[in-house]
Amino acid sequence: MKTYDFMNVNSFSPKERPIRLFGFEFGASHEESESKDNYNENNESIKDDNKEKRFKCHYCFRNFPTSQALGGHQNAHKRERQQTKRFNLHSNAAAFFHRQQNHIAASRLYEDRYSLEAVQINDARLGLCRMYNSSASFNRDRSSYYNRYIPWFIGDHQTRPTYVGGGSSSHGLFYESKKNVPDHVSLDLRL
């Protein structure tokens, strides 16, 4: 076991270590030639590693030379996905709003093979219409069962649908409005 003088730094430092500048070692006589050979071998292996090391995008499978380039490219993919997501959310919300507006304020009859939903609305009676469940079942003569409905106000009574149109090919459905509601309602706000 060696004893070290901890007050003297040279007692436990390596004896002579060559200085390495730009891949070349200086300061060792016979080790210098060996280190050059080792450096050349190490340098070639590093070049081979760099040739093999490619960074691949997981979305479009492009190869990039550095991880930084790949990161920037993947950020672009992230922005594209966020924009697509925002567009889909906005378009779905707009389609839902448009569909609801068509159900509430339809000016013509609407019929499709799964549901009969059309509403004729007077501005004064906007909140007094009933909207029936769209998953109603149908008989052979295309009349439907409306046992379930969605009231818009608590305490509302169910109204019966009125069929409009004479032909069997097109049946229109309007909702009856309540008879005791005045035609004109004031929209002035008063305290």
Curated annotation (Swiss-Prot):
SUPFAM superfamilies: beta-beta-alpha zinc fingers. InterPro entries: GIS/GIS2/ZFP8, Znf_C2H2_sf, Znf_C2H2_type. One of its GO terms (molecular function) is zinc ion binding. Keywords: Cytokinin signaling pathway, Developmental protein, Differentiation, Gibberellin signaling pathway, Metal-binding, Nucleus, Transcription, Transcription regulation, Zinc, Zinc-finger. GO terms for cellular component: nucleus. Pfam families: zf-C2H2_6. Induction: By cytokinin and gibberellin. This is Zinc finger protein GIS2. The lineage of its organism: Eukaryota, Viridiplantae, Streptophyta, Embryophyta, Tracheophyta. The gene is GIS2.
